[in-house]
Amino acid sequence: MLHTPSIKQASLLWDVAGLVAGVDEAGRGPLAGPVVAAAVILDDLQPIKGLADSKILSARRREQLFDEIRAKALCCCIAQASVEEIERLNILQATLLAMRRAVEGLRLKPALVLVDGNRLPVLTMRAEAIVKGDALVAAISAASILAKVHRDRWCAEVDVQYPQYGFARHKGYGTVQHLAALTKHGACPQHRKTFGPVAEVLREALP
C-alpha cells in the first residue's frame, strides 16, 4: 500500500538546502524590557493569508496570525536579549544577538536568512539585509508578528507586577504617561537604565 504523507510530512521532505528563513525584531525603541527576535521558515504548501508588517495589523489580527504561523510554518523560533544584555552590549548589539539566537534555535537549518533592516547578525549561513523587509517578504512579516506578539504578551505580564507604569498600554515606549510614571515612581528592574529618559530620571533622583 502506497503511503501518502500528510502536507506537514511532505513539507519536511523538501531539500533543506533550499530553505529560506525570515528574521525580524520587536522592542528596540522601548524604555523597558527585553528585545525580542523571531526567525520563521514558511511552508509553501500551507500559505498564510494576510501576512504583513506587524505594525499595520490590529492586535487581534496579530494574535490570530501568531497562532496560524506557529501551526503552519515549517519551523520557527522566538528568542530575546535581556535588559542586562542590552545594558552591557547596547541595543543594536543586543538586537543582533537575539536575532542570532532565533536563527540558531530553528529546528531546520536554512540556506539563506533574510533579515529586516540594514544590519546583519553573525551567522554561519548566507544572509541578506532587506530594508522594509517586513512589508516585502512573507517570512519576515511572519517573524515580525511572532516577535511583536511575544513582546506584547511580556508587557501584559509585567504590567501585573508593576501596574504603576502601565506597560500593557504603552508597551514600554516613552509616552507622556510612561515618562510621568517614571518621574513619580522611579525606575523598576525592567527599565533600561542606559536609555536617555530613564537615565535622566535616575540622575534627578540623586541627592
Swiss-Prot record:
It is found in: Cytoplasm. InterPro entries: RNase_HII, RNase_HII/HIII, RNase_HII/HIII_dom, RNaseH-like_sf, RNaseH_sf. A divalent metal cation binds at residues 24-25, 116. Its cofactor is Mn(2+); Mg(2+). SUPFAM superfamilies: Ribonuclease H-like (SSF53098). It comes from the Bacteria. One of its GO terms (molecular function) is RNA binding. One of its GO terms (cellular component) is cytoplasm. Residues 18-207 form the RNase H type-2 domain. The keyword Secreted does not apply. Belongs to the RNase HII family. This is Ribonuclease HII. It comes from Albidiferax ferrireducens (strain ATCC BAA-621 / DSM 15236 / T118). The lineage of its organism: Bacteria, Pseudomonadati, Pseudomonadota, Betaproteobacteria, Burkholderiales.
